[in-house]
Regions:
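C-terminal structured "cap/appendage" subdomains that terminate the fold
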Residues: 485-552
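TRNA-binding/sensing appendages of the translation machinery
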Residues: 2-109, 172-211, 287
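Acidic, His- and aromatic-enriched active-site or binding-groove loops in soluble protein domains
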Residues: 94-114, 222-237
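Generic long, charged, amphipathic alpha-helical segments
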Residues: 454-508
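Charged, low-complexity intrinsically disordered tails and linkers
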Residues: 2-38, 122-155, 438, 448-452
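Short acidic loop-to-helix transition motifs that present clustered carboxylates
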Residues: 85-88, 311-314, 500-507
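Extended, low-hydrophobicity, polar/charged segments
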Residues: 42, 121-129, 154-168, 175-434, ...
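C-terminal, non-catalytic macromolecule-binding modules
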Residues: 432-462
Length: 558
């Protein structure tokens, strides 16, 4: 971490909100602990929070550390607008996708449809487009930290899943696939360095589903934690791991004991030519469909949505929940591997009834069916590994703190971004991008490192580097010693919290422990002039230190 000018010290006597006198509940959820200690606050809107002074200090540190990490790897820092036009998003085709999902926050400005963007691929292309002429202008690698918005359907978990959040993003543009893969490597390394720099160690990387951002390969950076709102699957034998939406399971060649139930789910699939037609998916009832795999099975350029249940009776003569594979012979059908190998299974035979003994080869009253097997299931905990014959997938709770996406020409081609190649012909650059959830990282850091006494921050990431606990701050001599010590520590570039409140020592110590700044310095009238006591929040070790040796704290904090 580079040495930088420290911000002005925070004095608890002037801090908003004032530190609460009552003790923290060590069993409280991390979000409540952050709120109790005055780092974050609630608003009247779900998924929207305030960062109070101490929380803002944390966010600013994470912002600086992540920006440094990307600049170290050759990225140029920029600031892109969050307010973006509908026209721009229609160029990429995502206006319809995101509004259909209900994820886009839209508004009108000056008679123009706009959105508060949840991501900035379109704006990155629009920013590069006027300046890209030749292959000599590539690669372009941009980094930005910005506030984003998403109309999250179920905001929860405090800062973990909100409607307004800060991201550290990066976008890359390259002349060819080899260059793009080099940039993807840089994105992953920059994310790793940034996450390590903010104090998240042991972050796991795993292949993942790119969702509405990318149809190409992606990599999640995950912190394994029991408070995570995501999960990662890993084989308990070979270690093969990833997001369930892209992993494949294997299924027995014959039906397991007890007949599985086969569900039928119908999608409206729009092809590259704009024509929409229904497609049914047959899948085991205890599994979910991976829309990423289904789209890949149908081929490039297909967009799929669940068919409106009200359209089913007119199309197939049955309502949702009563469809069987035999009702879908007039439309396209995909049979997931979870059911294509079954010799016997159960199907719906009415809203409340099930029919056993069905078979793809036919059964009483049912003709044989042609199968179109495909891998379209989402792998789940307990399923057999698709990579090795001996293991099963086990799910672990995790927090997704970063994501790297291989975009290819997904945006650049649609938005007519071109350059002149070395042979003089027009070319389309290949893109990559990444995102680190800075707001989410605040709560993740707090949750990972907290103990029974409260929060614990790694050096350089919390609201301060040093918590100066001034005992008997009402004494004139103590006030003078405080001023000298603060001046010295600030000159050393250390970020400070100064507890100068006229309170008993015990209350100040409890507050310092709960807030979790890595080093507390105790300034007591019992100490000789120039002498203090240092308390390490992580080890609890107390040791004397003189004012002549305060510079050692700078080495510790870096």
């Amino acid at each position: 971490m580079r040495t930088a000018a420290a911000p002005a010290p925070i004095y608890t006597s002037r801090l908003f909100p004032a530190p609460r006198p009552r003790a923290t509940d060590p069993t409280a959820p991390t979000w409540e602990l952050l709120e109790h200690l005055g780092l974050v606050g609630r608003t009247d809107a779900a998924g929207v929070h305030t960062l109070l002074p101490l929380g803002l200090r944390v966010r600013d540190q994470l912002d600086r550390i992540t920006r440094d990490a990307f600049e170290h790897h050759g990225f140029n820092s920029v600031s892109l607008p969050t307010l973006q036009s509908r026209t721009l998003w229609e160029e990429s085709g995502r206006w319809k996708v995101y509004t259909a999902e209900g994820a886009l926050i839209t508004t009108r400005v000056g008679g123009t449809d706009m959105c508060l963007a949840p991501t900035s691929e379109e704006m990155a292309v629009a920013t590069v487009r006027p300046h890209l002429r030749s292959h000599r202008d590539l690669p372009v690698r941009l980094a930005l930290n910005t506030t984003k918005f998403r109309d999250e359907t179920s905001p929860r978990g405090g800062l973990m899943r909100g409607r307004e959040f800060t991201m550290a993003d990066a976008y890359t543009f390259d002349a060819n696939r080899a260059g793009m893969l080099e940039s993807i490597g840089l994105l992953n390394r920059a994310c790793t360095d940034a996450l390590t720099g903010i104090g998240l160690h042991g972050v796991v990387q795993a292949p993942a589903d790119g969702g509405a951002i990318s149809a190409g390969p992606t990599t999640e950076h995950l912190v394994l934690a029991d408070f995570g709102q995501s999960s990662i699957l890993a084989c308990d034998y070979c270690g093969h791991r990833g997001d369930g939406a892209i992993l494949s399971a294997t299924f027995p060649a014959t039906s397991p004991p007890g007949e599985p139930v086969v569900n039928v789910i119908v999608f409206a699939v729009t092809g590259p030519d704009g024509t929409t037609r229904p497609t049914a998916v047959c899948i085991r009832s205890d599994l979910t469909i991976s829309t990423r795999k289904l789209a890949a099975t149908l081929g490039p350029g297909h967009h799929l949505e669940l068919l409106d249940p009200e359209d089913l009776p007119g199309l197939l003569g049955k309502s949702a929940g009563t469809l069987t594979p035999w009702d879908c012979t007039r439309i396209d059908v995909v049979h997931d591997h979870s059911v294509s190998g079954l010799d016997r299974f159960t199907i719906a035979d009415g809203p409340e009834d099930l029919r056993t003994g069905a078979s793809w080869a036919g059964a009483t009253g049912l003709p044989p069916l042609d199968l179109h097997p495909a891998d379209v299931h989402t792998a789940a905990d307990g399923l057999d590994c698709g990579r090795c014959p001996a293991g099963r997938y086990r799910a672990t709770e995790a927090v997704e703190v970063a994501h790297v996406f291989e975009l290819g020409t997904q945006y650049s081609a649609k938005m007519s971004l071109t350059f002149t190649g070395d042979d003089g012909t027009p070319r389309t650059p290949l893109m990559g991008c990444s995102g680190i959830g800075l707001t989410r990282c605040i709560q993740t850091l707090a949750g990972v490192h907290r103990d029974a006494e409260g929060l614990r921050w790694k050096h350089g990431t919390g609201p301060a580097d040093v918590h100066l606990v001034v005992l008997r701050s009402d004494l004139t001599e103590q006030q003078e010693r405080t001023d000298r010590t603060v001046q010295q520590l600030h000159h050393l570039g250390l970020r400070l919290i100064v507890d100068d409140r006229p309170l008993p020592a015990g209350e100040k110590f409890r507050y310092a422990q709960a807030l979790g700044v890595p080093t507390a310095l105790v300034l007591s009238p019992r100490h000789a002039d120039g002498e203090l006591e240092a308390v390490d929040r992580w080890t609890g070790r107390r040791s004397p230190i003189t004012s002549d040796h305060l510079h050692t704290l700078r080495r510790t904090a870096s």
